Curated annotation (Swiss-Prot):
InterPro entries: DNA_clamp_sf (IPR046938), Pr_cel_nuc_antig (IPR000730), Pr_cel_nuc_antig_C (IPR022649), Pr_cel_nuc_antig_CS (IPR022659), Pr_cel_nuc_antig_N (IPR022648). It comes from Daucus carota. The keyword Repeat does not apply. This is Proliferating cell nuclear antigen. Keywords: DNA replication, DNA-binding, Nucleus.
Length: 264
């Protein structure tokens, strides 16, 4: 038997909105410690990992580890029917091929339940090794989203370069080039508006902007974003989910082809 009651139902809606365009179908894994998801996007370029820890739920019952295969587009449609202030309960019986979402208004005068069929999804669980990163950048999530949006009107890739001076986002396209530099500033009154850079060594990597723009859909979950970079590893773009957990996006860097490679 599985029963999870989340008072802040809007959190689950925001999580779904941030991943539904990236991943079609995925397994939600429930254990005694939390509710999690790990899935590759359809083109196997990006990986998303979500964790909602059990202590963040008002009520959390998971008698045994259970994996529920769901179509994320369909799940998002159901969650759209919940009000932003609604309490969301997720229920599934052992051996059942359905999951029930229950939405209660805060005043308890309206209760809706939606049942959805589960799917059998083959998915290998990828071990994500803990790594030491060359550079870690923490910055306002709205700022990062704005930079990715602005640069994608010029080019389709972004070069993220971290030096002790700051972090630089650059692109080039048919109409020209663009460079945006964010310097470290920790003196702001509000910590969520700070840009903090931890650098062991300089790093410069190229990524597809369409994925970065997709990741920034998670901005409503957190006022800050953490970007972890290392030359031989995928970038990790992480948004903390209140006190409950996180959503992490992993994206392999693009290898820049040598321009003169094709010449005889």
């Amino acid at each position: 038997m599985l029963e999870l009651r989340l008072v802040q139902g809007s959190l689950l809606k925001k999580v779904m909105d941030s991943i539904k365009d990236l991943v079609n179908d995925a397994n939600f894994d429930c254990s005694a410690t939390g509710f999690s998801l790990q899935a590759m996007d359809s083109s196997h370029v990006a990986l998303v990992a979500v964790l909602l820890r059990s202590e963040g739920f008002e009520h959390y019952r998971c008698d045994r580890n259970i994996s529920m295969g769901m179509n994320l587009g369909n799940m998002a449609k159901m969650l759209k029917c919940a009000g932003n202030d609604d309490i969301i309960t997720i229920k599934a019986d052992d051996g059942s091929d359905t999951v029930t979402f229950m939405f209660e208004s805060p005043t308890q005068d309206k209760i809706a339940d939606f049942e959805m069929k589960l799917m059998d999804i083959d998915s290998e669980h990828l071990g994500i090794p803990e790594a030491e990163y060359h550079a870690i950048v923490r910055m306002p999530s709205a700022e990062f989203a704005r930079i990715c949006k602005d640069l994608s009107s010029i080019g389709d890739t972004v070069v993220i370069s971290v030096t002790k001076e700051g972090v630089k986002f650059s692109t080039r396209g048919d109409i020209g080039t663009a460079n945006i530099v964010c310097r470290q500033n920790t003196t702001v009154d509000k910590p969520e508006e700070a840009t903090v850079i931890e650098m062991n060594e300089p790093v410069s990597l190229t990524f597809a902007l369409r994925y970065m723009n997709s990741f920034t859909k998670a901005s409503p979950l957190s006022s800050t974003v953490t970007i972890s970079l290392s030359s031989e590893l995928p970038v990790v773009v992480e948004y903390k989910i209140a006190e409950m957990g996180y959503i992490r996006f992993y994206l392999a860097p693009k290898i820049e082809e040598e321009e003169d490679e094709s010449k005889p």
